[in-house]
UniProtKB/Swiss-Prot annotation:
Keywords noted in UniProt: Mitochondrion
Alphabetized PANTHER family for the sequence: COX1/OXI3 INTRON 1 PROTEIN-RELATED, COX1_OXI3 INTRON 1 PROTEIN-RELATED
Signal peptide coordinates: none
Superkingdom classification of source: Eukaryota
SUPFAM superfamilies hit by this protein: DNA/RNA polymerases (SSF56672)
Protein name: Uncharacterized mitochondrial protein ymf40
Keyword field contains Mitochondrion: yes
Taxonomic source organism: Marchantia polymorpha
Coiled-coil annotated spans: none
One Pfam short name: Intron_maturas2
Domain Reverse transcriptase residue range list: 49-333
Cellular-component GO terms for this entry: mitochondrion
InterPro entries found in the cross-reference section: DNA/RNA_pol_sf, Domain_X, RT_dom
GO biological process: mRNA processing
Length: 502
């Protein structure tokens, strides 16, 4: 097992690596509450910080508190550390992550190496037979993490008291809000700190372990169902009529209809599955609704008693996947319900289509809503010009529209209904035409006549300089999950979990 100790913090090389990583991100060059930037970060500066860490005189500075609007109209609190503190936090992350990462479970996907929303959704894709889905929503998760509990979880693997003391210095650094100092109340992991994703995963790792116990407790061994004798009887009747020379077409159709009304299996067992991405999680249940209700109650009790967290009652839903859809990581989840008999024979008999296969679909109404907020269309999806882009040059305008499309296309590459992105292409195409028309002082008909619906702009040699390069078709690739992390759904649109990394 990888171990960590305070002495690792005193290596100037790890500070250099942390600095190189942080300076590559423009947002990290912004000053914190102390107005300091990374521009003056030098070898002498590193040596000074290392000396302070060595004699334990180092103190974190208060983070600058900012508030950004959430989708529900409320404000989300961010804590922006000074660039110096970002570097120290990055060094701490590099020391702590190798210790905790091997302990995290396969059910956890948020803010982890080689994991992404796609790895979480790929796991759910395999949940064939799931009847119910519990959509989890923890009330104010990041604001309600108990630091005494979190320190205890860290101390299970980190035995160096100086590292734990440095953690408490970070916690107690507090904030500066509009020039006024605010003490830390010892609850909440501020979003915006480098360590926030790792700390939040350490905290909810306890929930992951609890869910492993729930899975073992409620997942039965053996087959989950047995053949329904009533269905078998109806099926045999249907095939006899098909083979009979005396049966009328009406009799055959009626027998087939009666057969397809029935389920071919009777549920005899249960199965529980679970996936988490940051503070967003879902539980898949194969079994009766009563089992899903029982699990939800046990989850609520565990979170309250062991982690001092509460479920958001109105947002924690139990969804019947055969009748409705659950929303997780910007994706609608349901199961196939179509019943039909395939003509091919398997083992001397006819094979029936598999029911309960997971469908992952695009929440097209949400996407249109985001395009409406962007100004590309109205609430009904009718395209219009994005007036704030009129002052860009034509190439920049086209690049803006293509970037929006690529974000959605790369994220939803796995969707069962990826053809719905053709509606997004339509909106973006004609919004772009309207925007270019406004810029050039032309009507849309003249823009289309001059440049085509792809807005093809050529240079003086007649080479294509700019073009809307939308695909003409969108083939369905259900298992087309990205190996590298795609855009986080928080960037595409505001889901229920908050952006926590700076």
């Amino acid at each position: 097992m990888t171990k960590c100790n305070y002495e690792q913090l005193l290596d100037p090389e790890i500070f250099r690596l942390a600095y190189e990583l942080k300076k590559s991100k423009s947002g990290n060059m912004k000053p914190g509450a102390d107005k300091e930037t990374l521009d003056g970060f030098s070898q002498a500066y590193v040596e000074k910080v290392v000396r302070q860490l060595k004699d334990e005189s180092f103190q974190f500075r208060p983070s600058r508190r900012e508030f950004i609007p959430k989708a529900d109209g409320k404000l989300r609190s961010l804590g922006i550390p000074s660039p110096r503190d970002k570097i120290v936090q990055e060094v701490m992350r590099r020391i702590l992550e190798p210790v905790f990462e091997p302990r995290f479970l396969d059910s956890s996907h948020g803010f982890r190496p080689h994991r992404s929303p796609h790895t979480a959704l790929r796991q759910i894709r395999r949940w064939t037979g799931t009847s119910w889905m519990i959509e989890g929503d923890i009330k104010g998760y990041f604001d309600n993490i108990d630091h005494h509990l979190l320190a205890g979880f860290i101390a299970e693997l980190v035995k160096d008291q100086r590292l734990l003391a440095l953690y408490w210095k970070l916690v107690r650094a507090g904030y500066v809000n509009q020039g006024k100092a605010e003490p830390h109340l010892l609850t909440g992991v501020p979003q915006g700190r480098i360590l926030s994703p790792l700390l939040s995963n350490i905290y909810l790792h306890q929930f992951d372990l609890f869910m492993e116990e729930i899975k073992v407790k409620y997942t039965t061994t053996g087959a989950l169902s047995k053949n329904n004798p009533i269905y078998l009887k109806a099926r045999n009747k249907y095939y006899k009529l098909v083979k009979s020379l005396k049966a009328s077409s009406a009799e055959i159709i009626r027998a087939r209809r009666d057969m397809l009304k029935m389920t071919y299996g009777i549920q005899t067992g249960s199965r529980v599955r679970y996936v988490r991405y940051a503070d967003d999680w879902v539980i898949g249940v194969t079994g009766p609704k009563a089992l899903a209700v029982q699990i939800k109650e046990e989850v609520s009790t565990f979170l309250q008693e062991k982690l001092k967290l509460s479920l958001q009652a109105e947002k924690t839903r139990i969804t019947n996947l055969s009748r409705s859809e659950a929303l997780f990581l910007g994706t609608l989840i349901s199961i196939t319900t179509r019943k039909y008999v395939q003509s091919q024979k398997v083992g001397g008999g006819h094979r029936r289509a598999s029911l309960g296969r997971i469908r992952l679909c695009i929440p097209i109404d949400i996407l249109i809503g985001k395009l409406s907020q962007m100004g590309a269309c109205d609430e009904k999806g009718t395209p219009k010009a994005v007036t704030k882009w009129i002052f860009l040059n034509v190439g920049e305008i086209i690049n803006k529209y293509m970037a929006v499309f690529r974000g959605y296309y790369n994220y939803y590459s796995f969707a069962d209904d990826i053809h719905h992105l053709l509606q997004i292409i339509y909106i973006l195409r004609y919004s772009a035409i309207n925007t270019v028309a406004r810029k050039l002082g032309l009507n849309t008909a003249k823009v289309i006549k001059r440049f085509g619906v792809d807005l093809i702009f050529r240079d003086h040699t007649n080479e294509i300089k700019h073009k809307l390069n939308f695909p003409r078709s969108l083939p369905n690739k259900r298992m087309n999950f990205a190996l590298s992390p795609p855009s986080d759904p928080r960037v595409l649109f505001d889901t229920s979990c908050a952006r926590i990394q700076c």
